């Protein structure tokens, strides 16, 4: 593991330097990685091009371009688009200070000049009420110093993309107060990668939910690769539910740099992306991250030879919209005159998702309409009902004599 070299440079700082734990210096992603590094968690080595370096590189043309942004509303798409174009052009055309080039070069050489990832880390991101996930650009498998510097410049420019400007306005984050740090880390070449939520982001249930694909994690984040889904007991790490899909594609690093979506050999497609050892380790780290950051986390990870590497941890921002519910009593939800069964013919075998509920509702409504048209009037819960996220279906009654006879 690399160590911080002397006093913190105002332009570049290492992830294991205490100064990098300040979001005002290293941005949201960088400061979280620095805190994880301090605790000895498996974070790839790296350094941060600080928000101060970004401010030093800001040109007069950029400052001019920001003026209309400060007056725009989230729905003023024309004004936002024009301001975005001018701001990004100003960043692309402004020379980078030679002092910063030297600082980045020294850090890059210290890391050995190997392949790196260049990732955004804005000073206002990954907050409890606004994640900014996907708003800024990041670049993987950068092989040369010049391309890395260009990646830093492109990350800066993404701070002023139309979607980022509009999202900040919508989230109440002043465009005048946000800066951009850049995290440069040693590139991991994983067997599998993915995301892990320490609460179900849809239902708020207390379980760990893992989505994992083969290759690089962009396959999961961008939806470019099929992903397995595993639900884990948060206390033991034991699998509650596992869905292994056919993974015919993945995102992989290319020998010439950058990444691409590639095919997966047929023999590997139905193998689980993650082994039991990796899932247990992920659960251990997830519990530590929840304790460290004080709440449910959205975690990005990569796995090499079943060893887990942490790439990011941020608060889950969707839970405020989830209303936790107590266990539903049977009374009032099912007609006691009939028999009911869960997992009828294998349909709705586990806790259901909202899309499945919508399908079930339409199915139930259609059946009820058929009964009404044939004169067999029935209420909605004569056919199908939902109790504690499980679908129950009415089944044929069994004569008591049959039950008594075994």
Residue ranges and their predicted role:
Residues 1-39, 45, 49-58, 78, ...:
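Conserved divalent-metal-coordinating catalytic cores
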């Amino acid at each position: 593991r690399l160590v911080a070299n002397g006093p913190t440079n105002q332009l570049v700082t290492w992830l294991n330097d205490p100064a990098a734990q300040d979001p005002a210096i290293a941005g949201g992603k960088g400061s979280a990685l620095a805190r994880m590094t301090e605790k000895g968690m498996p974070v790839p080595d790296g350094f941060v091009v600080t928000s101060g370096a970004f401010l030093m590189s800001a040109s007069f043309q950029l400052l001019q371009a920001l003026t209309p942004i400060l007056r725009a509303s989230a729905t003023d798409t024309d004004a936002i688009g024009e301001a975005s174009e001018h701001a990004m052009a100003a960043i692309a055309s402004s020379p980078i200070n030679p002092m910063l080039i030297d600082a980045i070069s020294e850090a890059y050489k210290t890391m050995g000049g190997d392949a790196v990832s260049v990732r955004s880390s804005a000073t206002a991101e990954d907050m409890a009420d606004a994640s900014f996930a996907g708003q800024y650009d990041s670049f993987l498998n950068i092989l040369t110093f010049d391309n890395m510097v260009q990646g830093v410049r492109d990350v800066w420019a993404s701070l002023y993309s139309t979607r980022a400007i509009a999202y900040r306005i919508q989230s109440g984050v002043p465009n005048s107060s946000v800066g951009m740090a850049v995290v440069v880390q040693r590139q991991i070449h994983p067997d599998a990668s993915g995301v892990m939520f320490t609460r179900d982001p849809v239902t708020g249930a207390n379980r760990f939910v893992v989505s994992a694909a083969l290759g690089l994690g962009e396959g999961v984040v961008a939806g470019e690769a099929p992903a397995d889904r595993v639900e884990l007991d948060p206390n033991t790490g034991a699998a509650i539910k596992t869905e292994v899909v056919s993974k015919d594609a993945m995102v992989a690093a290319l020998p010439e740099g950058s990444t691409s979506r590639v095919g997966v050999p047929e023999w590997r497609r139905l193998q689980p992306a993650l082994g039991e050892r990796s899932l247990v380790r992920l659960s251990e780290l997830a519990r530590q991250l929840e304790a460290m950051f004080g709440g449910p986390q959205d975690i990005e990870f990569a796995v090499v030879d079943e060893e887990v590497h942490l790439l990011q941890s941020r608060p889950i921002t969707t839970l405020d919209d989830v209303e936790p519910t107590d266990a539903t009593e049977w009374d009032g939800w099912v007609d006691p005159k009939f028999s009911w069964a869960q997992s009828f013919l294998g349909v709705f075998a586990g806790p259901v998702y909202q899309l499945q509920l919508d399908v079930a509702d339409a199915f139930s409504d259609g059946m009820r309409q058929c009964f009404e048209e044939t004169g067999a009037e029935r209420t909605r819960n004569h056919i199908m009902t939902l109790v504690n996220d499980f679908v129950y279906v009415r089944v044929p009654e069994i004569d008591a004599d049959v039950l008594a006879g075994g």
